[in-house]
Amino acid sequence: MFTIDFSDHTNLVKEDWFTQIDKLLTFAKEQENIEEEAELSVTFVDKDEIQEINKMYRDKDKVTDVISFALEEDEPEITGIEMPRVLGDIIICTDVAQEQADSYGHSFERELGFLALHGFLHLLGYDHMNEQDEKQMFGRQDQILNAYGLTRD
Protein backbone atom coordinates (compact mmCIF):
# COMPACT_ATOMS: atom_id res chain seq x y z
CA MET A 1 0.00 0.00 0.00
CA PHE A 2 1.15 3.54 -0.78
CA THR A 3 -0.51 6.38 1.12
CA ILE A 4 -0.23 10.01 0.08
CA ASP A 5 -1.74 12.64 2.34
CA PHE A 6 -2.68 15.73 0.30
CA SER A 7 -3.23 19.21 1.69
CA ASP A 8 -4.06 22.27 -0.42
CA HIS A 9 -3.54 25.57 1.38
CA THR A 10 -4.31 27.46 -1.86
CA ASN A 11 -7.61 25.89 -2.98
CA LEU A 12 -6.21 25.94 -6.54
CA VAL A 13 -5.57 22.24 -7.09
CA LYS A 14 -8.55 20.33 -8.40
CA GLU A 15 -9.51 17.12 -6.63
CA ASP A 16 -8.85 15.02 -9.73
CA TRP A 17 -5.23 16.21 -9.71
CA PHE A 18 -4.73 14.72 -6.28
CA THR A 19 -5.70 11.45 -7.96
CA GLN A 20 -3.37 12.07 -10.92
CA ILE A 21 -0.41 12.87 -8.69
CA ASP A 22 -1.20 9.83 -6.55
CA LYS A 23 -1.13 7.66 -9.70
CA LEU A 24 2.12 9.25 -10.92
CA LEU A 25 3.92 8.81 -7.60
CA THR A 26 2.61 5.25 -7.24
CA PHE A 27 4.02 4.56 -10.72
CA ALA A 28 7.34 6.18 -9.70
CA LYS A 29 7.43 4.05 -6.53
CA GLU A 30 7.09 0.95 -8.72
CA GLN A 31 9.74 2.24 -11.13
CA GLU A 32 12.11 2.71 -8.19
CA ASN A 33 11.40 -0.87 -7.02
CA ILE A 34 10.03 0.15 -3.64
CA GLU A 35 7.98 -2.85 -2.65
CA GLU A 36 7.20 -2.18 1.00
CA GLU A 37 4.32 -0.07 2.27
CA ALA A 38 5.15 3.63 2.26
CA GLU A 39 3.60 6.99 2.95
CA LEU A 40 4.33 10.65 2.33
CA SER A 41 2.58 14.00 2.26
CA VAL A 42 2.16 16.54 -0.53
CA THR A 43 1.17 20.08 0.43
CA PHE A 44 0.31 22.90 -1.98
CA VAL A 45 1.14 26.42 -0.79
CA ASP A 46 1.45 29.98 -2.12
CA LYS A 47 4.61 32.07 -2.54
CA ASP A 48 4.47 33.62 0.92
CA GLU A 49 4.19 30.27 2.66
CA ILE A 50 6.95 28.53 0.68
CA GLN A 51 9.28 31.51 1.20
CA GLU A 52 8.63 31.30 4.94
CA ILE A 53 9.31 27.54 4.95
CA ASN A 54 12.43 28.00 2.81
CA LYS A 55 13.76 30.67 5.19
CA MET A 56 12.93 28.73 8.34
CA TYR A 57 14.28 25.32 7.34
CA ARG A 58 16.83 26.03 4.62
CA ASP A 59 18.02 29.52 5.63
CA LYS A 60 17.12 30.81 2.14
CA ASP A 61 14.87 33.86 2.15
CA LYS A 62 13.40 33.36 -1.30
CA VAL A 63 10.55 31.72 -3.16
CA THR A 64 11.13 28.30 -4.70
CA ASP A 65 9.01 25.78 -6.61
CA VAL A 66 9.30 22.66 -4.45
CA ILE A 67 10.85 21.70 -1.12
CA SER A 68 11.24 18.15 0.15
CA PHE A 69 11.86 16.98 3.68
CA ALA A 70 13.10 13.40 3.71
CA LEU A 71 12.22 11.76 7.01
CA GLU A 72 14.56 8.81 6.53
CA GLU A 73 17.82 10.78 6.52
CA ASP A 74 19.96 9.83 9.51
CA GLU A 75 17.00 8.24 11.29
CA PRO A 76 17.47 5.01 13.25
CA GLU A 77 15.53 2.07 11.88
CA ILE A 78 12.83 0.69 14.17
CA THR A 79 12.63 -3.08 13.96
CA GLY A 80 9.94 -5.42 15.14
CA ILE A 81 7.08 -3.04 14.43
CA GLU A 82 5.01 -3.36 11.27
CA MET A 83 4.76 0.23 10.11
CA PRO A 84 4.87 1.73 6.63
CA ARG A 85 8.04 3.39 5.44
CA VAL A 86 7.53 7.15 6.00
CA LEU A 87 9.33 8.88 3.14
CA GLY A 88 8.70 12.51 4.09
CA ASP A 89 6.99 15.67 2.94
CA ILE A 90 6.80 17.46 -0.41
CA ILE A 91 5.74 21.11 -0.48
CA ILE A 92 4.83 22.61 -3.87
CA CYS A 93 4.24 26.30 -4.60
CA THR A 94 1.27 26.54 -6.97
CA ASP A 95 2.11 30.16 -7.91
CA VAL A 96 5.58 29.17 -9.12
CA ALA A 97 4.18 26.03 -10.76
CA GLN A 98 1.83 28.20 -12.84
CA GLU A 99 4.64 30.62 -13.76
CA GLN A 100 6.91 27.76 -14.82
CA ALA A 101 4.12 26.08 -16.80
CA ASP A 102 3.54 29.34 -18.68
CA SER A 103 7.28 29.82 -19.23
CA TYR A 104 7.82 26.26 -20.51
CA GLY A 105 4.63 26.22 -22.57
CA HIS A 106 2.93 23.26 -20.94
CA SER A 107 -0.02 22.76 -18.63
CA PHE A 108 -0.24 23.64 -14.94
CA GLU A 109 -1.13 20.00 -14.30
CA ARG A 110 2.02 18.76 -16.07
CA GLU A 111 4.12 21.13 -13.96
CA LEU A 112 2.47 19.90 -10.75
CA GLY A 113 3.29 16.33 -11.79
CA PHE A 114 6.88 17.26 -12.61
CA LEU A 115 7.35 19.02 -9.26
CA ALA A 116 5.71 16.19 -7.30
CA LEU A 117 8.00 13.65 -8.96
CA HIS A 118 11.03 15.91 -8.43
CA GLY A 119 10.21 16.13 -4.73
CA PHE A 120 9.58 12.38 -4.55
CA LEU A 121 12.99 11.61 -6.03
CA HIS A 122 14.58 13.90 -3.43
CA LEU A 123 12.82 11.89 -0.71
CA LEU A 124 14.48 8.78 -2.14
CA GLY A 125 17.93 10.35 -1.95
CA TYR A 126 18.38 11.78 -5.44
CA ASP A 127 19.97 15.22 -5.56
CA HIS A 128 21.39 17.78 -7.96
CA MET A 129 24.15 19.41 -5.93
CA ASN A 130 26.77 18.63 -8.58
CA GLU A 131 26.70 18.04 -12.33
CA GLN A 132 26.89 14.24 -12.15
CA ASP A 133 24.08 13.97 -9.59
CA GLU A 134 21.98 16.47 -11.55
CA LYS A 135 22.39 14.44 -14.74
CA GLN A 136 21.37 11.26 -12.93
CA MET A 137 18.37 12.81 -11.16
CA PHE A 138 17.01 14.72 -14.15
CA GLY A 139 17.57 11.71 -16.41
CA ARG A 140 15.61 9.49 -14.04
CA GLN A 141 12.90 12.12 -13.77
CA ASP A 142 12.54 12.24 -17.57
CA GLN A 143 12.50 8.42 -17.81
CA ILE A 144 9.66 8.14 -15.30
CA LEU A 145 7.62 11.02 -16.74
CA ASN A 146 7.95 9.66 -20.29
CA ALA A 147 7.14 6.09 -19.23
CA TYR A 148 4.10 7.39 -17.39
CA GLY A 149 3.07 9.50 -20.39
CA LEU A 150 3.30 12.94 -18.79
CA THR A 151 5.28 14.79 -21.45
CA ARG A 152 5.90 18.47 -22.08
CA ASP A 153 3.40 18.48 -24.96
UniProtKB/Swiss-Prot annotation:
Q: How is the cofactor bound?
A: Binds 1 zinc ion.
Localization in the cell: Cytoplasm
List the molecular function annotations (GO) for this entry: metalloendopeptidase activity; RNA endonuclease activity; zinc ion binding
Summarize where Zn(2+) binds, as residue positions.
H118, H122, H128
Enzyme superclass (EC): hydrolase
One GO cellular component term: cytoplasm
The protein here is known as Endoribonuclease YbeY
